[in-house]
């Protein structure tokens, strides 16, 4: 399919795609932060797309797509190696030629078990249930919050040193089971962090989603590869502010998003 009509279907399908990921997955920025019992990260995202990728990975004109999202990630360690995860989200989605969608997005509830390593490097397994939010049956653009999802994730973290500076690498891979018509998904995410100053952290993130084949109905197989670049500045002993940009570098049957985000990190 070509043209704006088929691209509109791409936009509808991509409402079910991944929200911005790794900034919401409980990034550990250094070994010292691991000593805290918990953290809360509130992140605001704005993105838009006037172009998309067809089934061959070529860029095409699509119906204008605009998205505003708010994520609230809460983590709390109930044991040295086990952390509870809770992440509600709110969204506003607008697709040219369709109705706007506003309301509660997915809410993730789960846990992370660290089965190997220490404060400087570890391996962990995560499992989360994603509970759908507000949806409307009369509008395909609302299918993004219609059915439950189940994410099974393997995660590795390692502190790094660069002379007198510090950093970290955080690698994650997951398989996401999705009820309903959309296909299941593979996820591969990588974050590199560099701290040139004790109060300032630079992060580069690669976020990759590949469908496990095609789903039913409008859901063809798809993939998309996003990057995020951001800085996090500590303004108080337990409070930091984040500001960054994001974009889609490539994909198939996907949006080409461009946007920005900001967040507040609080540890306790």
Model-based region annotation:
Residues 1-28, 32:
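Cleavable N-terminal export/targeting peptides
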Residues 23-178, 187, 191-268:
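Transmembrane beta-barrel domains of Gram-negative outer membranes and organellar outer membranes
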């Amino acid at each position: 399919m070509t043209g704006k009509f088929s691209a509109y279907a791409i936009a509808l399908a991509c409402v079910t795609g991944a929200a911005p990921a790794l900034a919401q997955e409980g990034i550990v920025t250094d070994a010292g932060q691991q000593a805290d019992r918990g953290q809360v990260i509130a992140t605001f995202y704005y993105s838009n797309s006037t172009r998309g990728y067809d089934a061959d990975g070529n860029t095409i004109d699509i119906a204008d797509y605009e998205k505003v999202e708010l994520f609230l990630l809460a983590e709390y360690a109930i044991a040295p190696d086990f952390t509870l995860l809770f992440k509600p989200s709110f969204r506003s989605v607008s697709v040219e030629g369709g109705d706007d969608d506003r309301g509660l997005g997915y809410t993730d509830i789960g846990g992370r078990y660290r089965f190997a390593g220490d404060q400087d490097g570890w391996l962990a397994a995560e499992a989360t249930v994603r509970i759908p939010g507000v949806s409307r049956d009369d509008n395909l653009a609302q299918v993004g919050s219609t059915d439950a999802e189940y994410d099974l994730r393997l995660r590795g973290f390692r502190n790094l040193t660069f002379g007198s500076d510090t950093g970290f690498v955080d690698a994650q891979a997951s398989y996401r089971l999705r009820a309903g018509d959309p296909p299941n998904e593979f996820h591969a995410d990588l974050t590199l962090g560099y701290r040139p100053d004790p109060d300032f952290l630079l992060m580069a993130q690669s976020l990759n989603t590949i469908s496990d084949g095609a789903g039913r109905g409008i859901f063809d197989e798809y993939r998309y590869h996003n990057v995020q670049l951001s800085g996090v500045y500590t303004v108080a002993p337990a409070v930091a502010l984040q500001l960054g940009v994001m974009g889609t570098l490539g994909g198939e049957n996907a949006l080409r998003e461009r946007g920005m985000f900001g967040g507040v990190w609080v540890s306790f």
